[in-house]
Regions:
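Glycine-rich P-loop/Walker A and Walker A-like loops and their local beta1-loop-alpha1 context
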Residues: 1-60
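Long, charge-dense
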Residues: 61-97
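Short beta-alpha junction loops
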Residues: 50-54, 77-80, 151-162
């Protein structure tokens, strides 16, 4: 099996990729992908996190040698933990059930950061807060917006969270699907 870096090396900067990692590869693959996009390709990225705080991710990525100054975070975790600031290189969103608010916040982050690439971590985490039908509509709208912004994206989804039929639907909105399970 190819390494994560090899699989993503040929991805065009304006492609939308659905990435379905194995649970064991999930934690290592994200820093590898960011190293490729941020450090090698010198792209500003918007990182949408549904299940981890931006502080935790920022620390992790810094320790892995990733230029976190090129990453703007949209965090749906920290505001619920009592943090209430949108200063600097992040936006906090109170509720991952508010998909309209999430879309608006992502659009603001792309504009504010001059983001050239979006990483959405993860579509399957939205399943904890929203119905599959709402997630599917959100994903369809998000991919249309990404194309209108003329940027690329990697949308992460864990394999066991959605039925194969829904994964196939999600794949239809993307340019490529990379499944490593």
């Amino acid at each position: 099996m190819e390494s994560i870096r090899e699989e993503f090396r040929d991805i065009e900067d304006k492609s939308i990729v659905l990435f379905i990692p194995s649970i064991t590869e999930y934690h290592q693959s994200i820093p590898d992908i960011l190293d490729l996009l941020v450090n090698e390709r010198d792209l500003n990225c918007v990182y949408v996190t549904i299940n981890k705080s931006y502080r935790r991710l920022n620390d992790l990525f810094s320790k892995k040698g990733i230029n976190t100054g090129s990453i703007f975070f949209v965090d749906t975790v920290s505001k619920g933990l009592g943090f209430d600031s949108n200063d600097g290189d992040f936006f906090l969103l109170a509720d991952p059930r508010n998909l309209s608010g999430l879309s608006i916040t992502i659009a603001k982050a792309v504009k504010r950061s001059n983001g050239r690439f979006l990483i959405f971590d993860s579509l399957s985490s939205l399943n904890l807060y929203n119905s599959v039908s709402r997630i599917s509509k959100f994903f369809h709208a998000l991919t249309a917006e990404i194309r209108s912004w003329n940027i690329g994206a990697i949308v992460i989804s864990m394999d066991e969270e959605f039925k194969e039929e829904l994964i196939n639907t999600f794949s239809g909105f993307c340019d490529k699907t990379i499944k490593r399970v």
